[in-house]
Structure formats: structure tokens, C-alpha cells
Amino acid sequence: MGCDDKCGCAVPCPGGTGCRCASSARSGGGDHTTCSCGDHCGCNPCRCGRESQPTGRENRRAGCSCGDSCTCASCGSTTTTAPAATT
């Protein structure tokens, strides 16, 4: 899998180190691809921050773990509170 706009890379790729993927297979961890930014391909590294150590799936969106302040569209809503019941 290559880097794309979901991985923080410009499309079409302008070339250079800004859009280069590397496989962590070199470190013995199997064939797992990451962007040069260090995030997994297919996961937009939202600039608003990400959960450093997620405790559950409540903040996870398509393999991304977004911080509480994240409102970017690629991460989606991370609000975990249930909607208020209407009476």
C-alpha cells in the first residue's frame, strides 16, 4: 500500500522525502507500511493531535486514534457521550 492523501501526502505525490513510505519489515516487525511522518498509511496524522495511548476503541476511527480536541473530518467525531434523550 502506498501513501496517499489519507496519510498526509499530497496527491499526486510531488516526490521527495515528504511522500515516502517505509516498511517496518526492516526492523523485524513484519510488512507494515508507515509514512515518513511516522504514521500508518491510510491514517491521516491530524495536526490537532492524537490520543497518545488509547485506552479503548471509543476514540478510534479507521485505525486512527484521535485526541479529544480533534475535529478534522478525516478523524471524524470522537465524541463518546450518548445523545441526550428527548422527551
From Swiss-Prot:
The keyword Metal-binding applies. Pfam families: Metallothio_PEC (PF02068). One of its GO terms (molecular function) is zinc ion binding. It comes from the Eukaryota. Induction: By hydrogen peroxide, ethephon, abscicic acid (ABA) and salicylic acid (SA). Barely induced by heavy metals. Expressed in developing seeds. Keywords: Metal-binding, Metal-thiolate cluster. Metallothioneins have a high content of cysteine residues that bind various heavy metals. Belongs to the metallothionein superfamily. Type 15 family. This is Class II metallothionein-like protein 1A. The gene is MT21A.
